[in-house]
Amino acid sequence: MTLASQIATQLLDIKAIYLKPEDPFTWASGIKSPIYTDNRVTLSYPKTRDLIENGFVETIRAHFPEVEVIAGTATAGIPHGAIIADKMTLPFAYIRSKPKDHGAGNQIEGRVLKGQKMVIIEDLISTGGSVLDAAAAASREGADVLGVVAIFTYELPKASQNFKEAGIKLITLSNYTELIAVAKLQGYITNDGLHLLKKFKEDQVNWQQ
């Protein structure tokens, strides 16, 4: 079993991901979605947490061997990033969604040196907007952002477009395609549900039609 399928299995088992193609969720954007993800709960399950953190470390070593600092996005990327930095004996920092409105007005908390090679940790990629904003902030502070590594992606076309336009490399430990395949295999969804989930990936607006 691949790492992607192992993580997909764990996310379903601990209910970090819910699939309801026949009774969809409503995202903050107003989009009706057959999937809901809360990867924060992975921190409460040591087996799942270890699988994810070890996966992060292996992936970073394979794709970004020159990394010098790990950064987490506030707030979901902070705990994972801190654990990864500890495992890799690397400095850690975190990136706020916007600068503080008091004190020194920092957006990056921690010490990042000019030109330091950074990998940013995120828990979930939908369109990628927030983590790309974080990457831009890190670049403005002088970091050399090598890429983003995340637990899971919905594989939305908008995300691919956004990362391509930003020139930022994205790697995820698991993904939507792997997840729905595992969900069908393990009986979480029906054939009809699988069909709807595939349609959502292709067209997030009209998938129910």
From Swiss-Prot:
Q: Which coenzyme or cofactor does it need?
A: Mg(2+)
Gene Ontology molecular function terms on file = magnesium ion binding; orotate phosphoribosyltransferase activity
Q: Which residues bind 5-phospho-alpha-D-ribose 1-diphosphate?
A: 96, 100, 102, 122-130
Which SUPFAM superfamilies does this chain map to? Answer: PRTase-like
Tell me which Gene Ontology terms the entry assigns under biological process: 'de novo' UMP biosynthetic process; pyrimidine nucleobase biosynthetic process
Any one Pfam family here would be Pribosyltran
Enzyme Commission no: 2.4.2.10
Q: Which residues bind orotate?
A: 126
CDD domains referenced in this protein's UniProt entry, alphabetically? PRTases_typeI
User: Pathway it belongs to?
Assistant: Pyrimidine metabolism; UMP biosynthesis via de novo pathway; UMP from orotate: step 1/2
The record's PANTHER family line, in alphabetical order, gives:
OROTATE PHOSPHORIBOSYLTRANSFERASE (PTHR19278), URIDINE 5'-MONOPHOSPHATE SYNTHASE (PTHR19278:SF9)
* Self-association and partners: Homodimer.
Matching HAMAP family: PyrE (MF_01208)
Q: Please give the function described in this protein's UniProt entry.
A: Catalyzes the transfer of a ribosyl phosphate group from 5-phosphoribose 1-diphosphate to orotate, leading to the formation of orotidine monophosphate (OMP).
Family recorded in the similarity comment: Belongs to the purine/pyrimidine phosphoribosyltransferase family. PyrE subfamily.
Q: What protein name applies here?
A: Orotate phosphoribosyltransferase
Record organism: Streptococcus pyogenes serotype M2 (strain MGAS10270)
Output the lineage of the source organism: Bacteria, Bacillati, Bacillota, Bacilli, Lactobacillales
Name the gene behind this protein. Answer: pyrE
